[in-house]
């Protein structure tokens, strides 16, 4: 039997129908069992084989047999495991949002760095061109003074071309300064659902592969589950607290009742012991009185015998 088939049987039938060698070492309600897994919404399982599994890692036990045991027990009474599962999902969404913020910040820093480097490079280009323009302007004046009009006009045209080049560089620099993440200068943007970096210049099919991937779909479903559970979480927490409070009150009353019953029995046993001791002391005194009475009668009889003998003599 393959591991997959074994897991399917365990998930359907529960731990009672699993071989002893493969039976979980703890019950489904043990604190080490993942309660989000029991409800089928553990974030770690929602993003399989992706980098987000390290972000939303889960160290609790995931046993298919536990899930079947829980579903069977849940029909008997409400365990309120959705409250614990919500807290797990909420924490996972928070961690992913932190990861997304880090990626976005990195992209923005990269754009700023690239913008600064590009600006420095273009400033250097402009300085070199302006130096050429200054030199050629001096040459134009010299040629004009010498009457070389045709050569002067050629240099003048060249200087105008250099000035147009400077304008093009300055215009492109303005575009870079106003650019941000997601623009043509950055090319990359971050997916707001799962934090993946997307290149907007990629082919549509490649971008579609991302949106259809396990990591993206898993995080979208996790966020949807989180928002849905958030609508009723306050009410569910209140219900659980009321139930736990009722159970604690019942347990206290039972504890007090056992102590009271134990006290009554103790008093009853104490009374019986005291009665028994009193009876023993009474019997002991009676025996002592009888012994003393017999001794007195024997003494009186001996005295009478001695008096009778004395008279005869």
UniProtKB/Swiss-Prot annotation:
GO terms for cellular component: U1 snRNP; U2-type prespliceosome. Residues 237-313 are annotated as: Disordered. It comes from the Eukaryota. GO terms for biological process: mRNA splice site recognition. Disulfide bonds: none annotated. Pfam families: LUC7 (PF03194). GO terms for molecular function: mRNA binding. Belongs to the Luc7 family. This is LUC7-related splicing factor homolog. It comes from Caenorhabditis elegans. The gene is luc-7L.
